[in-house]
Design a protein with these regions (language model features):
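Short, well-structured beta-strand/strand-turn elements
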Residues: 52-65, 184-195, 335
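Short coil/turn segments at secondary-structure boundaries
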Residues: 6-11, 40-51, 59-64, 86-93, ...
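Short hinge/gating elements
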Residues: 8-16, 31-33, 136-144, 288-293, ...
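A charged alpha-helical hairpin associated with nucleic-acid processing machineries
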Residues: 115-116, 159-167, 197-403
Length: 403
């Protein structure tokens, strides 16, 4: 996802017609930004995209733009068109500076963010120059039109393919969506200014015509680094009916899809999606990978940590299957013993799970404790649990994603 920067200027108690005016303002400023991308001043923005392997056709399809130099260039342009400052502020296009109205974005590459109807409702902006002291990425602030918990970049281009193929690919950045699209994966979207959450999920479920049971595929692409592990754990903590149909694709060498396409070509991006693995398998294997299962102690520690994860799977047949797989993955001789421990863990009252999460949250990195019962929650002091602990922090901060 793209790091969010900016406050909230959300309009409330709007007058009749206000929504249409804000849509019109966003359309007008988008046309202005698109024309600016062709100017000599925007050479750095154009080169940013061209250097990442995007053709002019792909850049055109995504309707990229450029916010020019000058504090109020776009604002003055729209004021001359008849929009009021109040409308521009409510649309997230302008804000009040020390000396009057100014543009929200300056000297940045812009991606328009659209709703399902194809209306521009906001922008994502990428820093281009070192003397730009604001965040690397910025987004339109919250407005009547733009709700970061609901909008998905690229959805306007991907919606038909998502509906027809019953598949959506969730990536983490604007250029990742573009890379997927350029490589022929036309179902990719990204959240804008926040992590992928429950409301984003509902948007995709509706597109896949799923009113009762999720029968499509949702594929997460994660960087093969620590942040990617956190994202996977956060997704795993989401709605189980959905998670059972979700998959993970991890690019090699910590590359994101944009880097992968740039270095290894379109076919590598398509293979990344084709080689997806089930979300449950990815999370369990990630936990196991933190231990040395070539030792008895390592196998025991891996089992202690992985059993509570398997116990979270609500689908009972699937839970049994992964309990047996877990036994094989860690080299545990008696699969039935593992299954019994998973069932025992699953029967524990849910109230008992919350202190465990808080313990992870407050943990300090210290050597692991050894005198722990077979299926007792692992000590928060185990240093190798850091990625999971951080993932749980994120889950606590975003309860809408938690199951």
């Amino acid at each position: 996802h793209i790091n969010y920067q900016g406050g909230s200027t959300g309009a409330r108690n709007e007058k009749p017609g206000t929504r249409q005016r804000l849509i019109a303002a966003n359309k007008a400023v988008h046309e202005f930004y698109r024309k600016q991308l062709e100017t000599p001043e925007a050479a750095t923005a154009r080169n940013f995209l061209l250097d990442r392997g995007f053709s002019r056709e792909v850049i055109y399809d995504f309707e990229c733009g450029y916010a020019p130099e000058g504090w109020d260039t776009a604002t003055k342009h729209l004021l001359r068109m008849g929009f009021s400052f109040e409308e521009l502020e409510a649309a997230g296009i302008s804000k009040m500076g020390k000396r009057g109205p100014i543009d929200r974005f300056h000297r940045r590459l812009l991606w328009p963010i659209k709703d399902l109807s194809g209306n521009v409702i906001g922008f994502g902006a990428r820093k281009l120059f070192d003397d730009d002291k604001l965040g690397k990425y910025m987004n339109t602030s919250e407005t009547m039109l733009y709700r970061k918990s609901k909008v998905l970049f690229g959805l306007d281009l991907a919606k038909r393919n998502i509906a027809e193929n019953h598949q959506a690919v969730v990536v983490e950045g604007y250029t990742d969506v573009m890379a997927m699209y350029a490589a022929g994966v036309k179902t990719a979207v990204a959240s804008c200014g926040t992590a992928f959450g429950g409301e984003h999920l509902q948007v995709l479920r509706r597109l896949m015509l799923d009113d009762s049971y999720f029968n499509g595929e949702l594929i997460y692409t994660f960087d093969g680094d620590e942040a990617g592990q956190k994202a996977a754990m956060r997704a795993f903590d989401g709605e189980q009916k959905f998670t059972g149909q979700s998959f993970v694709s991890v690019a090699p060498d910590g590359m994101d899809p944009c880097d992968l396409r740039l270095h290894k070509g379109d076919a590598a991006v398509r293979e990344l999606i084709a080689d997806r693995i089930p979300m449950f398998e990815f999370v369990i294997q990630s936990v196991i990978a933190e231990y040395r299962i070539d030792t008895a102690e390592g196998r025991l520690q891996a089992l202690r940590r992985a059993v509570p994860v398997v116990a979270q799977i609500r689908d009972q047949p699937l839970q049994r299957e992964y309990a047996r797989r877990l036994a094989g993955w860690v080299g545990w001789a008696n699969p039935e013993e593992v299954l019994q421990q998973v069932r025992a863990e699953a029967r524990k009252p849910k109230k008992a799970e919350k202190p465990t999460i808080r313990r992870f949250d407050n943990a300090k990195q210290q050597p692991a404790q050894q005198d722990v019962p077979m299926i007792h929650p692992p000590s928060p002091k185990e240093t190798h649990l850091w990625p999971q602990r951080e993932a749980l922090k994120l889950a606590l901060q975003m309860p809408q994603v938690a199951g």
